[in-house]
């Protein structure tokens, strides 16, 4: 913060207005040579620190953790990498793979994965929107539909979007770009692509240009435009491409580049935590049932009779019932049976997760592990329901949570069972003649549609 202003030879006022520096960053090898020296000078001359925030960058190593060098032949040419994968995918990989202050084990296959799974998903989502928006001539010229009048799915994705804005803004503000990138990546792949767009496809396929279709376009446009702004500090090129393409058609923003716009601001009024929780439960049940289908080799087009879900609270029952139709449609099952007592049906097993217990309880971990494995069905049920459980041992109390244990259950005849946190799902895997015929009919229709 001294030489950059040619201080003390000139710019005294400029220097004083910018001292101490807000932020500096250098490699970890500069701890003594730079970080310490700046503070030492500031302490001697100004009785002050030299900077308010510092990040000590880690080193870029090869994928095996060795320092890159010409002698070892393990160096990666950055220009070849950028030419092959592009600067955005390279930047996104390097920032989201490890924290800036940690060493980065650079693996070229990781960039390829980012390009396919994140960049590809984001651009495919935009391409889906652009395809149907161009067909229908959507330019956002209609009056914007109030959020409270939109479908539950639209309100949910907008709620998640503003929750994301808040979290990303906090992460960047706390100098945690890795956390920000990972949050955005999860939102795009899991919330936007795998859930919102997939469940909304039929709304875009409709022939008529209805109010519901306009709502779908306006919602997806808003999400894509906001995402382009959120990713712009890390992925400057694809963000600008999406932003400019959107605004070329709508002219809603006069900025010529996403980098000349304001960063998104969270609207707390659009955040509905109850709705977010409800949809998260639906996503979790959907994932669990599809996993059970895969485990038992039952394709999704094969209808099944029933899902059985133990519910031990009115709140959980209310949340699942509110999205029951959506769940049944997604997993292709006829009905959900809710049970309030699973003791005669499911026998749970519990075992400790040492990776979680070790840092918390140290030398007591082994004794505590034995107590956990000795828990009865009522204790396991309490832990699943409340999310925590207290074990008393040697006149001491030890609090454990669902993150400290793994709860499993054996499959029961005719059923396949999965547990994830507080949710247990049992899938009826019996395929009757009637269900089999319905599955064949669905398969027949699918084959014909593919041929068309």
Predicted regions and their residues:
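Short, solvent-exposed helix-loop connector elements
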Residues: 102-111
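Short Ser/Thr-interspersed hydrophobic loop/turn segments at strand-loop and sheet-helix junctions
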Residues: 37-44
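Acyl activation and transfer enzymes in specialized metabolism, enriched
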Residues: 32-33, 442
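Feature 926 captures the class I aminoacyl-tRNA synthetase adenylation module centered on the KMSKS loop
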Residues: 1-3, 7, 45-83, 87, ...
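Structured mid-domain segments that build the active-site/substrate or prosthetic-cofactor binding neighborhood
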Residues: 93-96
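A short glycine/serine-rich beta->alpha loop
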Residues: 19-30
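Conserved catalytic-core segments centered on acid/base and nucleophilic motifs
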Residues: 26, 34, 230-233
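Cation-handling catalytic/transport regions enriched in His/Asp/Glu
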Residues: 15
């Amino acid at each position: 913060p001294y030489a950059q202003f040619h201080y003390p030879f000139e710019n005294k006022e400029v220097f004083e207005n910018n001292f101490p520096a807000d932020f500096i960053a250098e490699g970890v090898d500069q701890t003594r040579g730079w970080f310490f020296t700046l503070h030492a000078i500031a302490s001697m001359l100004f009785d002050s620190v030299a900077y308010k925030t510092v990040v000590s960058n880690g080193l870029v190593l090869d994928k095996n953790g060795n320092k890159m060098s010409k002698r070892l032949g393990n160096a990666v040419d950055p220009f070849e990498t950028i030419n092959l994968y592009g600067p955005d995918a390279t930047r996104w990989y390097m920032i989201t793979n490890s924290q800036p202050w940690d060493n980065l084990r650079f693996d070229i296959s990781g960039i390829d994965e980012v390009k396919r799974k994140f960049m590809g998903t984001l651009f495919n989502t935009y391409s889906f929107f652009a395809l149907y928006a161009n067909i229908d001539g959507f330019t956002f010229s209609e009056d914007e539909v109030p959020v409270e009048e939109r479908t539950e799915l639209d309100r949910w994705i907008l709620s998640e979007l503003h929750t994301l804005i808040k979290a990303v803004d906090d992460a960047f503000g706390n100098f945690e770009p890795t956390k920000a990138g990972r949050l955005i990546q999860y939102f795009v792949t899991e919330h936007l692509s795998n859930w919102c767009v997939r469940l909304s496809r039929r709304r875009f396929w409709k022939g008529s240009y209805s109010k519901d279709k306009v709502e779908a376009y306006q919602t997806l446009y808003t999400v894509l435009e906001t995402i382009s702004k959120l990713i712009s500090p890390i992925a400057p090129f694809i963000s600008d491409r999406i932003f400019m393409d959107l605004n070329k058609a709508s002219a809603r923003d006069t900025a010529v580049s996403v980098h000349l716009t304001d960063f998104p601001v969270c609207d707390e009024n659009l955040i509905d935590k109850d709705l977010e929780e409800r949809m998260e439960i639906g996503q979790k049940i959907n994932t669990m049932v599809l996993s059970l289908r895969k485990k038992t080799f039952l394709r999704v087009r094969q209808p099944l009779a029933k899902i059985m879900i133990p519910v031990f609270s009115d709140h959980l029952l209310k949340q699942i019932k509110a999205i029951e139709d959506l769940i049944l449609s997604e997993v292709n099952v006829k009905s959900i049976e809710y049970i309030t007592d699973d003791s005669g049906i499911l026998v749970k097993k519990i075992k400790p997760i040492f990776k979680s217990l070790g840092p918390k309880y140290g030398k007591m971990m082994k004794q505590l592990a034995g107590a956990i494995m000795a828990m009865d069905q009522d204790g396991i049920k309490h832990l699943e329901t409340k999310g925590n459980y207290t074990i008393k041992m040697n006149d001491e109390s030890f609090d454990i949570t669902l993150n400290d244990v793994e709860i499993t259950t054996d499959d029961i005849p005719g059923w396949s069972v999965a547990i994830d946190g507080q949710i247990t799902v049992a899938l009826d895997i019996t395929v009757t003649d009637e269900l089999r015929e319905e599955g064949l009919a669905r398969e027949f229709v699918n084959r014909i549609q593919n041929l068309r």
